[in-house]
C-alpha cells in the first residue's frame, strides 16, 4: 500500500505521484487555503473589534471631565454666595472705646466714672445719632466684637475677649441706660496686666439688659466648665471666681 512520506515537499510538479497522492496534496492545499481565509477573517474581526472599542473609548473620554468638573462647579456655586452673605449673630452696637481703670474689687457703680469719660470723648464727634460701628457677639467662652465698615458689614478686624478675664459687667449707668460696659483684664507683652473698661451703646435699654444677661450666662458656663476640669476649687464662691480666673489665666 502506497503512503505519503512525512517529508514530502510541497512541490508544484506532482506528475510523478500517483493519483491518490495528487488528491491528498490537493486536499492539503485546500486546507491551507481555508486556514489562511480563517486567519484573515480573524484578523479582520480583531481589527473591526479594536476599531469599535476605540470608538467607544473616544466617546467615553469626555465623561471623566463631566464627572470631576460638575461637582466642582456646583461647590463653587454654593459656597461663593455664602462667603459674600456671611452674617454674625449678635447685637449691633456703637463701640465707645476703652479706658484703663484701677482697683481689684469691682462693685456696683465701678464702671460709672470710666463710662462717663468714654461718653464725653465720643460726644465730641457726635452729630445726631451714633451710627452702629460694631457687632457684639457673646459666646459661651468668648466675646467677639466685630468691627463694621461704613456699609454696616462686618470686616475682618475683630476683637476677642476671653470670658475668664472679664471681671465685671453691667448695663446700669446714669449717663445713659443704653450703655453696656465690662471690665477686662488685658495681658501685656511683658506678662503684666491692666484692667480696661470697655463700653458700647445699644439701640435701646432692653438691648443693653439682654447683653448683661447673656454675659452673665456666658460667665456661668465658663465657671462650671473650669470647675469640672479642676481649675477652680469646688468650694469656691462666686466672689472668689475672679481671683481664681486671674491666677489661672495669668
UniProtKB/Swiss-Prot annotation:
Gene Ontology cellular-component annotations: cytoplasm
Q: Entry's Gene3D superfamilies? A: Pleckstrin-homology domain (PH domain)/Phosphotyrosine-binding domain (PTB)
Q: Does the keyword Zinc apply?
A: no
What are the annotated disulfide bridges?
A: none
Q: Where is this region: Disordered?
A: 229-250
Please explain the role this protein plays, according to its UniProt record.
Increases proliferation of preadipocytes without affecting adipocytic differentiation.
Q: Under which name does UniProt file this protein? A: PTB-containing, cubilin and LRP1-interacting protein
Q: Which organism is it from?
A: Homo sapiens
Amino acid at each position: 500500500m502506497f503512503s505519503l512520506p512525512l517529508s514530502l515537499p510541497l512541490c508544484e510538479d506532482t506528475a510523478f505521484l500517483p493519483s491518490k497522492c495528487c488528491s491528498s496534496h490537493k486536499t492539503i492545499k485546500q486546507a491551507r487555503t481555508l486556514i489562511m481565509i480563517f486567519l484573515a477573517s480573524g484578523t479582520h474581526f480583531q481589527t473591526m473589534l479594536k476599531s469599535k472599542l476605540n470608538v467607544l473609548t473616544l466617546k467615553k473620554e469626555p465623561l471623566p471631565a463631566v464627572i470631576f468638573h460638575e461637582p466642582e462647579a456646583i461647590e463653587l456655586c454654593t459656597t461663593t454666595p455664602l462667603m459674600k452673605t456671611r452674617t454674625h449673630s449678635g447685637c449691633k452696637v456703637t463701640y465707645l472705646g476703652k479706658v484703663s481703670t484701677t482697683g481689684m474689687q469691682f462693685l456696683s457703680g465701678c464702671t460709672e466714672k470710666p463710662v462717663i469719660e468714654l461718653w464725653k470723648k465720643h460726644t465730641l464727634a457726635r452729630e445726631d445719632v451714633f451710627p452702629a460701628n460694631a457687632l457684639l457677639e457673646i459666646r459661651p467662652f468668648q466675646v467677639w466684637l466685630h468691627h463694621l465698615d461704613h456699609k454696616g458689614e462686618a470686616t475682618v478686624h475683630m476683637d476677642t475677649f476671653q470670658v475668664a478675664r472679664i471681671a465685671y459687667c453691667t448695663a446700669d449707668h446714669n449717663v445713659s441706660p443704653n450703655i453696656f460696659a465690662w471690665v477686662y483684664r488685658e495681658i501685656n507683652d511683658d506678662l503684666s496686666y491692666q484692667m480696661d473698661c470697655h463700653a458700647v451703646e445699644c439701640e435701646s435699654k432692653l438691648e443693653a439688659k439682654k447683653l448683661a444677661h447673656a454675659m452673665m450666662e456666658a460667665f456661668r458656663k465658663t465657671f462650671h466648665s473650669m470647675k469640672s476640669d479642676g481649675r477652680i476649687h469646688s468650694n469656691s464662691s462666686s466672689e472668689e471666681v475672679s481671683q481664681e480666673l486671674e491666677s489661672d489665666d495669668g
